[in-house]
Amino acid sequence: MKKRILAIVFAAAMVLSTAACSSSTSNSGSTTDTKETTDTTDGTTYKIGISQFAEHGSLDNCREGFIQGLAEEGIVEGENLEIVYQNAQADTGTAGQIADSFISSGVDMICGIATPAALSAYNAAMKTDIPVIFTAITDPVMAGLANEDGTPVGNVTGTSDKLPVEAQLEMIRKILPDAKTIGILYTTSEVNSESAIKEYEALAGKYGFELETVGISTIADIPLAMDNIVTKVDCISNLTDNTVVQGLATEISKATAAGVPVFGSEIEQVKNGCLATVGLDYVSLGVQTGKMAAKVLKGEAKASEMNYETISECGLYLNTAVADKLGVTVDDEYASTAVEVFDTIAEQ
């Protein structure tokens, strides 16, 4: 059941877009895709460098949506757009190298997917006139990519994937009425996770929860961290944390063995074994970002004058196969409000 409940909040105008090409190569720590393009009738073509911080479903969906959003505005890969795609494989140093390579190759725009990629792109492009469009950033202000009022700090704008923490807490309380402690696994170096945890800490008591947080540095830390946390909590709630999401299969395997439900932060995680989320659709987030980028590429707006945007309403997504596996009963009336219900668990 696919009812979309996505209402887009425009903090200002709309933003950015640039180009793409494609033949495939890979570097150490990164992957690169390029594709040949052809000119449009008026001869205008664009070249966009896409830097994605890590390889997992949420960010992949964001990239797919970004390209789709550009196409909906007439900037089509293989026609008037060349896309150069590279993946930093969750390495900040590699993200910096990718950004520098985009600047050297003379792209018209850089799209940074996730906070470390966007920050690297912004720093690399700071002394140029190349606009940077970001997406999948939980807190652009804390990341230093936007001012407190949402205005850009430079030639940079985009979209935020801010987790609706209060709605998530309310959902957990409805599904697990007797739960007392929520566990959160997070990467200590990700500012987006720090921001989300502060909000959880501020709101958890309102819904009768205590928090148990465990920090990790790399994906290799997840097994031990999970062994530790599952003995102390009634459930786990994921953040939009790139390292944790990369290790989702391990997280869910450990939690399921302990009979502990995991609540996701977006749709893809629910498809892959999380019980539920009040989260966003990353394809839709990417589409909105692509439309912003198109405005910038066409000269209809300037990234430096556009506030970043968010998706204001997120929907309930539920996996009944996970509920059955864990013996969790979800109230029928509440389940009927879901945007989408999955009855299988996707293979990871």
Please place each PLM-identified region on the residue numbering.
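Sec-dependent N-terminal signal peptides of Gram-positive bacterial secreted proteins and lipoproteins
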Residues: 2-24
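Bacterial lipoprotein signal-peptidase II cleavage site
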Residues: 19-38
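Hydrophobic alpha-helical segments within soluble ligand-binding/sensing domains
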Residues: 42, 139-181, 280-301
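Extracytoplasmic "Venus flytrap"
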Residues: 46-73, 84-93, 189-193, 242-246
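Pocket-lining segment of extracytoplasmic ligand-binding domains
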Residues: 191-266
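Hinge/cleft segment of the Venus flytrap/periplasmic-binding protein
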Residues: 295-348
